[in-house]
Amino acid sequence: MLAIEGGLHEDAALIEACALLHDIGKLDVPPEIISKPGKLTPAEFEAVKAHARFGAQRIHDAIRLLEVAEITALLHHEKWDGAGYEGLVGENIHLFARIIAVADVADALLSERVYRARWSLSDTLAYMQAESGKHFDPQWIEVLMRCEDKLKNMYEGEEK
C-alpha cells in the first residue's frame, strides 16, 4: 500500500515480498527473548539486534538455492541425447538438472496419477535403464539402480 501510494508501482510486489522476509532472522533468536514481555537485558537486546545479521545471512544462503533452482526448473526436461526442451546435450546439461530428471521421472512412474496407475518398481527400473544414454545421464541411472531397496521401502506402501 505504501509503495503504491508513494509511486513505486513497479516495485510494489518486490517490496511486499521483502516485507515478508525482513524479520526472518528472528528465527535464530531464542523465542523466550522475542516474546519477553518486560524490558530486555543488555545481552538480550544484543541478541535481538543480531536478528538483522542472521536474516541477511539466511537470505544470502538462499541465493545459491534460488540460482540453482532457476537452472534446474529450466533444464529438468533436457535429455542426455539432446532431444529435450532446450536441446542441450550430455554434460552441457547442469548436473543437478540431470539428477532431478532421473528422480522426477522415477517418482512420476512410481506414483499413482489420475490418468494412469502407478508402475511397478521392476517396470520403472527397466524403463529407466532402457532410457539410459538417451533420456538420462547413464551415471545417474547407475546410481538409481543402486537405490532399488530404498525405492522399494519408499514406495512399497503404495503397492496395490
Question: Which residue ranges define each predicted feature?
Answer:
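Histidine- and acidic-residue-rich, metal-dependent catalytic cores
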Residues: M1-K160
